[in-house]
């Protein structure tokens, strides 16, 4: 029977199995929702897994306050349309310190507003399992991470002390205070994600489609002028370099730390065609991935997504 399933249907079945397994095994799971394409697919799979019932766990967005405005609008729209139980957490310490990606840099901003914010939220609500939309093809540290990624009481990941995973057998045993991060999309590729979005008609943030947008090139990265806050941190010379270009985003994060790519892809079929030809990583536009060699693995060791 499995042999008759298409590649995408096999991936779908595997992901749904993982999601149901976690819901059955753990006392208090949560699904992390970053509003991006992978989160959209993961949420769609979770709704399928428990249809016609509602999700048996909440959805959580760790908000840095620097997401694209279109992402916030899309999030609120999805929550209303799907009737999601959404938890939003913003690190109050980061807010009190006025942490932002311009003044404090990408590494500190990510550590305080994302990593520490996530750890605060997990501790506050006592979650023992957290679904994430990471895929192994995205980045080398994610390539070696298990589907069930064990975290100690401080939410730290030890890549040298991972549990074996044989076929579809997962070890979910944790002691009090420990937890796991679960990655149901581990075996999907970026192309798989886009083909599934197309076939299933999954709604996504419009930023993924090419359009004329105001951008400025900084250190080889096209940064979109999303709101007035960025203008406060640009010199007059930099402001004079703001131009309109037809761009889209392959990955979405905090807008000052996420680069656009020039593109003509205005539809899902265009994007899929582009994916068949591209030879660059989707995360090439993520500034945080360039903080230093092994920066992503170090972030994950400290508790990052």
Curated annotation (Swiss-Prot):
Keywords, alphabetical: ATP-binding, Nucleotide-binding, Nucleotidyltransferase, Transferase
Function, as annotated: With CysN forms the ATP sulfurylase (ATPS) that catalyzes the adenylation of sulfate producing adenosine 5'-phosphosulfate (APS) and diphosphate, the first enzymatic step in sulfur assimilation pathway. APS synthesis involves the formation of a high-energy phosphoric-sulfuric acid anhydride bond driven by GTP hydrolysis by CysN coupled to ATP hydrolysis by CysD.
Organism, scientific name: Pseudomonas syringae pv. tomato (strain ATCC BAA-871 / DC3000)
Quaternary organization: Heterodimer composed of CysD, the smaller subunit, and CysN.
Family: Belongs to the PAPS reductase family. CysD subfamily.
GO molecular function terms listed in the Swiss-Prot or TrEMBL record: ATP binding; small molecule binding; sulfate adenylyltransferase (ATP) activity
Pathway(s) served: Sulfur metabolism; hydrogen sulfide biosynthesis; sulfite from sulfate: step 1/3
A Pfam family the protein falls into: PAPS_reduct
Protein name listed in UniProt: Sulfate adenylyltransferase subunit 2
Leading EC class: transferase
GO biological process entries: hydrogen sulfide biosynthetic process; sulfate assimilation
Catalytic activity: sulfate + ATP + H(+) = adenosine 5'-phosphosulfate + diphosphate
EC number, as in UniProt: 2.7.7.4
Primary gene name: cysD
Entry keyword annotation includes Nucleotidyltransferase: yes
């Amino acid at each position: 029977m499995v042999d008759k399933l298409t590649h995408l249907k096999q991936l779908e079945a595997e992901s749904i199995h993982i999601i149901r397994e976690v819901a059955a095994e753990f006392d208090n799971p949560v699904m992390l929702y970053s509003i991006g394409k992978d989160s959209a697919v993961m949420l769609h799979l979770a709704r399928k897994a428990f249809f016609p019932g509602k999700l048996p766990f909440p959805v959580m967005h760790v908000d840095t306050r620097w997401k694209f405005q279109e992402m916030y609008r899309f999030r609120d729209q999805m929550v209303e349309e799907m009737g999601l139980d959404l938890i939003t957490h913003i690190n109050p310490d980061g807010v009190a310190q006025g942490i932002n990606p311009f003044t404090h840099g990408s590494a500190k901003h990510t550590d305080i507003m994302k990593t520490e914010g996530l750890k605060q939220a997990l501790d506050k609500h006592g979650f023992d399992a957290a679904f994430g939309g990471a895929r192994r093809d995205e980045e080398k540290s994610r390539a070696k991470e298990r589907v069930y990624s064990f975290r100690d009481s401080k939410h730290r990941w030890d890549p040298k002390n991972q549990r074996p995973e044989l076929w579809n057998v997962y070890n979910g045993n944790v002691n009090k205070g420990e937890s796991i991060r679960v990655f149901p999309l581990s075996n999907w590729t970026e192309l798989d994600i886009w083909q599934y979005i197309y076939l299933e008609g999954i709604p996504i943030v419009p930023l993924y489609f090419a359009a004329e947008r105001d951008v400025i090139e900084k250190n080889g990265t096209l940064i979109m002028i999303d709101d007035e806050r960025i203008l406060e941190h640009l010199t007059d010379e930099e402001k004079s370099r703001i131009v309109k270009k037809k761009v889209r985003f392959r990955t979405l994060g905090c807008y000052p730390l996420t680069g656009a790519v020039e593109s003509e892809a205005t539809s899902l079929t265009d994007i899929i065609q582009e994916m068949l030809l591209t030879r660059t990583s989707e995360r090439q536009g993520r500034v945080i991935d360039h903080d230093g060699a092994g920066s992503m693995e170090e972030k994950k060791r400290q508790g990052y997504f």
